[in-house]
């Protein structure tokens, strides 16, 4: 290399530049607060008598960073400083100023830097990613700064939210222990299923976990091959492997589907048929290694066309031999048309003119393997023409090259590595096969010298904490320095935008000669990882500059190095093992060890180095935009404005070779750009920057580089098993084994003896540690295998229904080297029944590495968790086994296993809610609640609980997305998820309770609701229940949507055109009388029938216009009021009277309002301290303590309340009256904060929010005592700080009498919820309902089967038809609808939509009429369950859910 360099230098003509003293000041462009940063001053000898000052000027003060006088030799001086806080709190643009005074010199220079408050990172770690109801949740919270040092600041609040966003627990003023918060929470046995959230720092940081009903998998299925595919291949091997969690291979049946899916867009046109997927199905058995392999011909698939997806979907299902338990694995593999690829390696994006440019080209085949002895055509594109070189790769697929640059004339040059010189022929009808060539664009490095500096690259990722030698080559031109002059090479090591390390190498050119090398020893730490940069430069006495820059790849490491291990790494269940922990002295270590089975269910939730680094998304390229430095060109042109820092990509670019147009700033080819690229500001009078070239630039080519991946290392322990005592009983099966905090002493080591749980599995353990001096550290995950060579295992479902039979499977495993004879016993119990207790004992012969399965048909007779005890032992028998007497080991001859199953009650769940609003006002306010049960209750199925909130809107606030427990698949039902959020937000905003967390969550729901509602919009601007599927838009729903969109504009973006289009459509349907015509199906029941139909509809539309902010003078409003005045005082319909009273209150027509309110008062029902209205009053003798209101009664009472509250000011008498109405409405709440249907929920929540804003007195401090006559007592404390916390406790005595006693100041909202199961009722007053089940094949009761259901239903009530109706079909255990059911049902009469949830099929009907409607579909059995209990079919009126009919259906084979 040096010979070529010297040949290049002989061509240069010497020219000695005038010796000018120079300086160079560097510091980070982004100064994070709080942090310690460095500023460096590099001075030449010419400044020996000059005093330099560097200052940082902010809005608040001027801070002197450095004051220094030059020396007689070149010297680099750096000093650390504390970054001041930014003015304004978040960020501030400050000025860095350097000045020099002395020796007849006076100058100064300044630049901008950004001071930015750095955010901390917080993570939440749970002991497991998912839980079952009733389990304990453990979680930790850690906050650290960007240097991974733990922060010990107090958390003002940590809250836990359930899937409905109920705040079910909170912890206030939480103080970490050495940066770690360790908390726990007990889930209720009836805990809601779904995703729970741990919210920290006012909701800015979240951790989540799931609550599900699951059974831990015992084995893992993996698609081992293929990992990648290419169109070049003729075939590929599919390999599926399955192993138990303790590492042994599993035997079972394998089904593999290898499919190429058809592209949906390809057959979207109506005239095209849907293309079938191209599939190959494979089946077989796993071998002794637990694997199954089979070849697949690539000719099966479409490799060149566009009609099919260019990826293969592999779905593998493995069924365990003997148990029938199955597990799945899915893999999508891209079929690459790429036949090979080339990449440049060990190259820069610039070259030094007249010095040889060297690099390498890596060549890979279609499978990413290195291609050896392969031709490479290197093409050089320059201003002087195009030149070619032919290279050959070595055994590593590398082709090195060296190019002479003297002929490039200091211009841009592009290099391309090609597989072949001829271009491939492109066929637009086919996916082209191609070679990925290598591209590299080179710019000349700007320098006024003929000297050279080059840094050798290091292959990464590099290890932290280990010294790395970096070799630097240089050549010094004689013109740049005389032989007796000392040359100083300055270097900076930059990580995460901070100057971490700096130094100088002083060399004497006389001693070193023209060319030489030196090395730097660098040690990388977490402050530098993962992508540090090194900049080296020299400024010669002549003024010339040489420089080079390199970026390293460093592992994501931490300064606190943590390791964890078990000794031995394999141990018997129930035996002791030593846990060995190592970390920095004084660390506090948080340990976690969980069953690998849990991680198989959720493998992506683990804490890792990458996830911790990901909390600090460090910014590397260029300067922050606030302090960017652009080159300004004097001429106007396409770049005559400040340019962005990111390269804009023109549309229609090719993904293989993309053209990037650059703005006019220097591009990485001078010392200035080196510093800019690593985020350092530089102030200097040296020639460090290339002059600006404002001429038009040619497009350049950009190439992306890929990164390789590693393979996990296999580890096997040869440590012998320690023997535990014989006849072990295994019944301790935690999913989390270890969850503890361990302090580390001065030795940096800790050893703890722990007992291995009873599960045969692998335990995955990890630990993180915190230290104030060494920061955060995270250990690799290690495993401990709990294993014994002879054991029994039980296969159980998560839950069963009492009375249903299920199959209990026991599998005995023999991993001894000999055959054994075993006896297996299932213990008797009164909690379950066996078909024949004589079959509870079995014996069999079991040879090495074999397994034997035994089955029993079990019927559970007791609710709750019941235990199954299975015992197996090795018999000392003379009966031959494997051709000889069975082997009997000295120890480990028996194994006993105890495992539970949850038994659930049969029947239909009924939920009753009693709500109470207690306002003690200085004296005790009390109420009695009687938990009474019906006679037809399912035995032992009762549960009851009480919930307490300090705010009347609290339950609704916590359940914004679940106010009504009904399907929500049409345009109006979607609005019940939308409208109440607006009212809740309005209330919270006025009450000063609207936190950023609540706003963020609520706005998210609004944005989703807005998007969904637009699906139901017609092209004319109107809306209907099912959108364009309906013939016309609907007047009522359009008014409802328009009102809500108008009110939501304050919180989210609503396109004004959507509102204007709807208003225009409604205006077109306003009659000359001012009334509104009923267009489309009128969904709302209360507006149907008789003369009041037009009046109530007009009232609703006019109210909607007024509520969205329209003035009474608006033509649509004024004409609507004119229509309503004609019948305002003459209407006798109670609902219409309440609605009109509200309308005229909004319009300010107080005379008419008062007349209507008097009419309402005459029909008000007063019950104790409550006031309400009902269209069908119920005699008081039949009054129920439970919430069972008619939806229309809730709605008209809510309108009456809105009318009472809508006036400029309220008297105390009016507030008292409103409170009495609220007392009744509050009692009608369901357990989720809503009411029975949609419109009653919307209007009632609107009224309650208005009351809460106007007249409600929230709790200051209240003690609520809940007690029973059976000596149960629980006290709840409610204050302003926990006003919105959802407090709950179980009520143990059912049936029973409970008393609620509230004392203190304010109001408290209490709900008592009673849940029990009953056998389905057969009431047919409003709907007829029957079902026929087609003939089923019952010959093979152990095989899955299909059932055809034919449902007959009609409306038999007092009206001509029902409102929208839902047919709700519950699935039999183990059954689900066959594929295509949705499309089949949508073709049947009146069906508007079909939805399938976990175990329920909902069929939406436009209405039901007197004529019987018939619906037929098929359900198929996917899980075999015997002795099936019946399932239910229910039909109900969506808007009058009390109108319903329910029947049962059964499997005819049972």
UniProtKB/Swiss-Prot annotation:
Detail the disulphide connectivity of this chain as listed in its UniProt entry: 40-78, 241-291, 259-279, 464-557, 589-769, 819-847, 845-881, 919-1307, 1075-1123, 1338-1453
Q: Which PROSITE patterns does the entry link to?
A: ALPHA_2_MACROGLOBULIN
State the InterPro entries in the record.
A-macroglobulin_rcpt-bd (IPR009048), A-macroglobulin_rcpt-bd_sf (IPR036595), A2M/Complement_sys (IPR050473), A2M_N_BRD (IPR011625), A2M_TED (IPR041813), Alpha-macroglob_thiol-ester_cl (IPR047565), Alpha-macroglobulin_TED (IPR011626), Ig-like_fold (IPR013783)
- Locate residues linked as Isoglutamyl cysteine thioester (Cys-Gln): 970-973
Give the matching SMART domains. Answer: A2M, A2M_N_2, A2M_recep, Thiol-ester_cl
Indicate which residues are glycosylated according to the record. 120, 281, 409, 857, 1020
- Tell me the tissue specificity: In the epidermis, expressed predominantly in the granular layer at the apical edge of keratinocytes (at protein level). Also detected in placenta, testis and thymus but not in epithelia of kidney, lung, small intestine or colon.
Query: Mind listing the GO molecular function terms for this protein?
Result: peptidase inhibitor activity; serine-type endopeptidase inhibitor activity
GO terms, biological process:
regulation of endopeptidase activity
Q: Which residues form the signal peptide?
A: 1-17
Where in the cell does this protein reside?
Secreted
Q: Which UniProt keywords apply?
A: Bait region, Disulfide bond, Glycoprotein, Protease inhibitor, Secreted, Serine protease inhibitor, Signal, Thioester bond
Question: Per the record, which residues fall in region Bait region?
Answer: 695-726
> Which cellular component appears as one GO term in the record?
extracellular exosome
The record's listing under SUPFAM superfamilies reads:
Alpha-macroglobulin receptor domain, E set domains, Terpenoid cyclases/Protein prenyltransferases
Q: Which disease is it linked to?
A: Otitis media: An inflammation of the middle ear resulting in earache, fever, hearing disturbance, and vertigo.
Partners and quaternary state?
Monomer.
Function of the molecule = Is able to inhibit all four classes of proteinases by a unique 'trapping' mechanism. This protein has a peptide stretch, called the 'bait region' which contains specific cleavage sites for different proteinases. When a proteinase cleaves the bait region, a conformational change is induced in the protein which traps the proteinase. The entrapped enzyme remains active against low molecular weight substrates (activity against high molecular weight substrates is greatly reduced).
Give the protein family: Belongs to the protease inhibitor I39 (alpha-2-macroglobulin) family.
Protein name listed in UniProt:
Alpha-2-macroglobulin-like protein 1
Q: What is the lineage of its organism?
A: Eukaryota, Metazoa, Chordata, Craniata, Vertebrata
Gene symbol here is: A2ML1
């Amino acid at each position: 290399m040096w010979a070529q360099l010297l040949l290049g230098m002989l061509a240069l003509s010497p020219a000695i530049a005038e010796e000018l003293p120079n300086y160079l000041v560097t510091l980070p462009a982004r100064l994070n607060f709080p942090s310690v940063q460095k500023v460096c001053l590099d001075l030449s000898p010419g400044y020996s008598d000059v005093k330099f000052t560097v200052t940082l000027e902010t809005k608040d003060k001027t801070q002197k960073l450095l004051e220094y006088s030059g020396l007689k030799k070149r010297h680099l001086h750096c000093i650390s400083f504390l970054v001041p806080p930014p003015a304004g709190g978040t960020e501030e643009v400050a000025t860095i100023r350097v000045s020099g005074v002395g020796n007849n010199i006076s100058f100064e220079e300044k630049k901008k830097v950004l001071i930015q408050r750095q955010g901390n990172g917080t993570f939440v770690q749970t002991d497991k990613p998912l839980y079952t109801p009733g389990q304990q949740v453990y979680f930790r919270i850690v906050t650290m700064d960007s240097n991974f040092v733990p922060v010990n600041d107090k958390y003002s609040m940590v809250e836990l939210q359930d899937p409905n966003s109920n705040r079910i627990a909170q912890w206030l003023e939480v103080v970490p222990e050495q940066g770690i918060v360790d908390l726990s929470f007990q889930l209720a046995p009836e805990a809601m299923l779904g995703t729970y959230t741990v919210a920290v720092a006012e909701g800015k940081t979240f951790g989540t976990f799931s609550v599900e009903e699951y059974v831990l998998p015992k084995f893992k299925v993996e698609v081992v091959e293929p990992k990648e595919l290419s169109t070049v291949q003729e075939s590929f091997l599919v390999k599926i492997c399955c192993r138990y969690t303790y590492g042994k291979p599993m035997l079972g049946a394998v089904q593999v589907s290898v499919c190429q899916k058809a592209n949906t867009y390809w057959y979207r046109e109506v005239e095209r048929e849907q293309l079938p997927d191209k599939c190959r199905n494979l089946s077989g058995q796993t071998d002794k290694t637990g694997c199954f392999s089979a070849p697949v011909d690539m000719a099966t698939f479409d490799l060149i066309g566009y009609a099919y997806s260019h990826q293969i979907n592999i779905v593998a299902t493995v069924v365990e031999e003997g148990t029938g338990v199955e597990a799945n694995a899915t893999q999508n593999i891209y079929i690459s048309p790429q036949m090979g690829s080339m990449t440049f390696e060990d190259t820069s994006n610039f070259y030094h003119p007249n010095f040889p440019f060297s690099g390498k080209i890596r060549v890979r085949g279609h499978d990413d393997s290195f291609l050896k002895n392969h031709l490479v055509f290197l093409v050089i594109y320059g201003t002087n023409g195009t030149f070619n070189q032919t290279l050959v790769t070595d055994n590593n697929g590398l082709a090195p090259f060296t190019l002479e640059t003297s002929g490039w004339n200091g211009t841009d040059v592009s290099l391309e590595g090609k597989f072949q010189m001829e271009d491939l022929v492109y066929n637009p009808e086919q996916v082209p096969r191609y070679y990925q060539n290598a591209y590299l664009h080179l710019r000349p490095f700007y320098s006024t010298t003929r000297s050279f500096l080059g840094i050798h690259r290091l292959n990464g990722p590099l290890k932290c904490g280990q010294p790395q030698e970096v070799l630097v080559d240089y050549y010094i031109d004689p013109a740049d320095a005389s032989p007796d002059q000392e040359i100083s090479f300055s270097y900076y090591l930059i990580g995460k935008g901070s100057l971490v390390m700096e130094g100088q190498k002083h060399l004497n050119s006389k001693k070193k000669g023209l060319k030489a090398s030196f090395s730097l020893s660098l040690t990388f730490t977490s402050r530098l990882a993962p992508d540090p940069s090194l900049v080296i430069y020299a400024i010669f006495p002549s003024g010339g500059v040489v420089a080079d820059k390199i970026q390293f790849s460093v592992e994501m490491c931490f300064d606190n190095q943590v390791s964890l291990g078990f000794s031995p790494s394999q141990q018997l269940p129930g035996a002791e093992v030593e846990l060995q922990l190592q970390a920095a002295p004084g660390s506090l270590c948080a340990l976690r060890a969980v069953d690998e089975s849990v991680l198989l269910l959720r493998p992506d939730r683990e804490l890792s180095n990458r996830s911790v680094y990901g909390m600090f998304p460090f910014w590397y390229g260029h300067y922050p935009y606030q302090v960017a430095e652009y080159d300004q060109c004097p001429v106007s042109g396409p770049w005559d404005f400040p340019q962005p820092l990111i390269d804009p990509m023109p549309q229609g670019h090719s993904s293989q070779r993309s053209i990037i147009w650059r703005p006019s700033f220097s591009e990485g080819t001078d010392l200035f750009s080196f510093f800019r690229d690593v985020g350092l500001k530089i102030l200097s009078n040296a020639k460090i920057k290339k002059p600006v070239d404002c001429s038009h630039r040619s497009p350049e080519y950009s190439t992306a580089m890929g990164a390789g991946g590693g393979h996990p290392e296999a580890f096997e322990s040869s440590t012998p098993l320690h023997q535990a005592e014989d006849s072990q009983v295994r019944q301790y099966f935690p999913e989390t084994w270890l969850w503890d905090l361990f302090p580390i002493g001065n030795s940096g080591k800790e050893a703890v003896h722990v007992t291995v749980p009873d599960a045969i599995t692998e335990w995955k353990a990890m630990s993180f540690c915190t230290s104030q001096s060494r920061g955060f550290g995270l250990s690799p995950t290690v495993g401990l295998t709990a294993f014994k060579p002879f054991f029994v295992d039980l296969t159980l479902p998560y839950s069963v229904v009492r009375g249903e039979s299920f199959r209990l499977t026991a599998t005995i495993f023999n991993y001894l080297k000999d055959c054994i004879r075993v006896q297996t016993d299932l213990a008797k119990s009164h909690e379950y029944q066996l078909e024949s207790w004589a079959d509870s004992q079995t014996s069999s012969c079991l040879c090495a590495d074999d397994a034997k399965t035994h089955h029993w048909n079990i019927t559970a007779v007791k609710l709750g968790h019941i235990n199954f005890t299975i015992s197996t032992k090795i018999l000392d028998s003379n009966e031959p086994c494997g051709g000889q007497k069975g082997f009997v080991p000295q120890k480990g001859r028996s194994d006993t296993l105890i495992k539970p199953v949850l038994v659930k009650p049969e029947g239909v769940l009924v939920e009753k809610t009693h709500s109470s609003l207690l306002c003690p006002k200085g004296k005790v306010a009390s109420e009695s609640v009687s938990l009474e049960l019906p006679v037809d209750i399912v035995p032992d199925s009762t549960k009851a609980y009480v919930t307490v909130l300090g705010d009347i809107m609290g339950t609704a606030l916590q359940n914004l997305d679940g106010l009504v427990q009904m399907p929500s698949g049409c345009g109006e039902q979607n609005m019940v998820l939308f409208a109440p959020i607006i009212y809740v937000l309005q209330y919270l905003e006025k009450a000063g309770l609207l936190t950023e967390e609540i706003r963020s969550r609520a706005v998210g729901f609004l944005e989703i609701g807005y998007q969904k509602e637009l699906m139901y919009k017609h092209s004319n601007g109107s809306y209907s229940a099912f959108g364009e599927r309906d013939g016309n838009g609907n007047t009522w729903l359009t008014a409802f949507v328009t009102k809500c969109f108008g009110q939501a504009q304050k919180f989210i973006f609503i396109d004004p055109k959507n509102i204007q289009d709807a208003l225009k459509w409604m205006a077109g349907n306003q009659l000359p009388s001012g009334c509104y015509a009923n267009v489309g199906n009128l969904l709302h029941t209360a507006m149907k029938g008789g003369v009041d139909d037009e009046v109530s509809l007009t009232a609703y539309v006019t109210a909607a216009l007024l509520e969205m902010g329209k003035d009474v003078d608006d033509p649509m409003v004024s004409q609507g009021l004119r229509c309503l005045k004609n019948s305002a005082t003459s209407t006798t319909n109670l609902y219409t009277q309440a609605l009109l009273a509200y309308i005229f209150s909004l319009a300010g027509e107080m005379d008419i309002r008062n007349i209507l309110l008097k009419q309402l008062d005459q029909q008000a029902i007063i019950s104790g301290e409550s006031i309400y209205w009902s269209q069908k009053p119920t005699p008081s003798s039949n009054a129920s303590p439970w919430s069972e209101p008619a939806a229309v009664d809730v709605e008209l009472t809510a309108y009456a309340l809105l009318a009472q509250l809508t006036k400029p000011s309220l008297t105390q008498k009016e507030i008292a009256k409103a409170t009495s109405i609220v007392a009744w409405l509050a009692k009608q709440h369901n357990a989720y904060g809503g009411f029975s249907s949609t419109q009653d929920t919307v209007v009632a929540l609107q009224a309650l929010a208005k009351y809460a804003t106007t007249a409600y007195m929230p709790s200051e401090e209240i003690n609520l005592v809940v007690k029973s006559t059976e000596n149960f007592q629980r006290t709840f404390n409610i204050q302003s700080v926990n006003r919105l916390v959802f407090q709950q406790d179980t009520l143990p005595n059912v049936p029973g009498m409970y008393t609620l006693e509230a004392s203190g100041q304010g109001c408290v909202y209490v709900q008592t919820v009673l849940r029990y199961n009953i056998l389905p009722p057969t009431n047919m007053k409003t709907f007829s309902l029957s079902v026929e089940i087609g003939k089923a094949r019952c010959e093979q009761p152990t095989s899955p089967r299909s059932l055809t259901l034919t449902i007959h239903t009609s409306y038999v009530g007092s009206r001509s038809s029902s409102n929208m109706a839902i047919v709700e079909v519950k699935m039999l255990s183990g059954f689900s609808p066959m594929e295509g059911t949705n499309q089949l049902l949508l073709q049947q009469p009146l069906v508007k939509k079909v939805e399938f949830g976990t175990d329920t099929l909902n069929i939406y009907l436009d209405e039901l009429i007197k004529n019987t409607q018939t619906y037929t579909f098929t359900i198929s059995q996917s899980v075999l369950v015997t002795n099936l209990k019946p399932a239910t079919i229910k039909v109900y009126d969506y808007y009058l859910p009390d109108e319903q009919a329910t029947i049962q259906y059964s499997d005819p084979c049972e």
